[in-house]
Amino acid sequence: MMKTSVMLMLVVVISLMCSGEAQEVARTYCGRHLADTLADLCFGVEKRGGAQYAPYFWTRQYLGSRGKRGVVDECCFRPCTLDVLLSYCG
């Protein structure tokens, strides 16, 4: 009986861990944080401060490249996922 309970608990814990990894968390990105995150994603710059080396005009170029609804509308005014941010990369 105890072995069955432990096994069941293990299955539940593993299921919860896997379902958490599969869901991408939506966050808000505004201002400098938005620009730095886009630079990191679009230019493959390391997260440890490399975004500051991305040229300003490149960063600005991708801030509104999807038509009327810009990245600010989708990711600053409401939460978005990294997949949405990646869709703004050239």
UniProtKB/Swiss-Prot annotation:
GO terms for biological process: positive regulation of activated T cell proliferation; positive regulation of insulin receptor signaling pathway; positive regulation of MAPK cascade; positive regulation of transcription by RNA polymerase II; positive regulation of vascular endothelial cell proliferation; regulation of muscle cell differentiation. This is Bombyxin B-7. GO terms for molecular function: growth factor activity; hormone activity; insulin-like growth factor receptor binding; protein serine/threonine kinase activator activity. It is found in: Secreted. Belongs to the insulin family. It comes from the Eukaryota. Changing S65N: In strain: Showa. Brain peptide responsible for activation of prothoracic glands to produce ecdysone in insects. The keyword Nucleotidyltransferase does not apply. Changing G49S: In strain: Showa. It holds the Pfam family Insulin.
